[in-house]
Regions:
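Extracellular/periplasmic carbohydrate-active domains that bind, remodel
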Residues: 1-177
Length: 177
């Protein structure tokens, strides 16, 4: 969904192993509930966005008040991802009571952005998440995503207030990267 409010995505099963095959991407949305869903994707299971570069800064509409709970995530580049198109900002994301497990799931929680995007990402909460295994990291914050992107630079992003509580992982290469 894009530019929407009061969204509920419940009991949806998404199987898409193709490239750029995200599961659910709320973009510049407010008051979103993603609940009891299953994601098996070739890209990000859930990717929260708010516009890319100049267009995102022009509209300046953040994604906010997003709850992800009771979901199962397999495969893909990230379980819950914020970005990379987050020029309008993202705030108040709550992830709880989810399960993730796959040797093909790269990351559990990922924030990706760069200085073409700018934007404020804040108040990201994850709790009570069980991870069997993931390939790379439980948490990855990448502030230099797509470093060769041909776009105007100088819009430094801000990421603050990222909290994780009772997130367990049996196997990953890194905890935080």
């Amino acid at each position: 969904p894009t530019l929407s409010k009061n969204i509920t995505v419940r009991k949806v099963k998404i199987i898409n192993e193709g490239p750029n095959g995200d599961g659910c991407d709320p973009e510049s949305c407010e008051d979103v509930l993603i609940e009891d869903c299953i994601f098996h994707t070739g890209d990000d299971c859930i990717a929260i966005k708010s516009g890319r570069n100049e267009d995102g800064r022009k509209w300046n509409i953040p994604s906010r008040n997003i709850i992800v709970r009771g979901c199962k995530m397999e495969d893909g580049h990230g379980g819950v991802v914020v970005g990379s198109e987050i020029s309008g900002g993202v705030n108040n994301v709550f992830v709880e009571n989810c399960e993730m497990d796959s040797p093909n799931l790269d990351r559990v929680l990922r924030i990706k952005t760069n200085n073409c995007r700018g934007g404020l990402t804040e108040n990201i909460y994850m709790r009570n998440v069980k991870v069997g295994q993931c390939r790379e990291a439980v948490l990855r914050i990448n502030l230099c995503y797509e470093p060769k992107e041909a776009a105007k630079r100088g819009f430094n992003p801000t990421v603050r207030n990222v909290y994780m509580e009772n997130v367990t992982c049996q196997k990953s290469r890194y905890g935080i990267l």
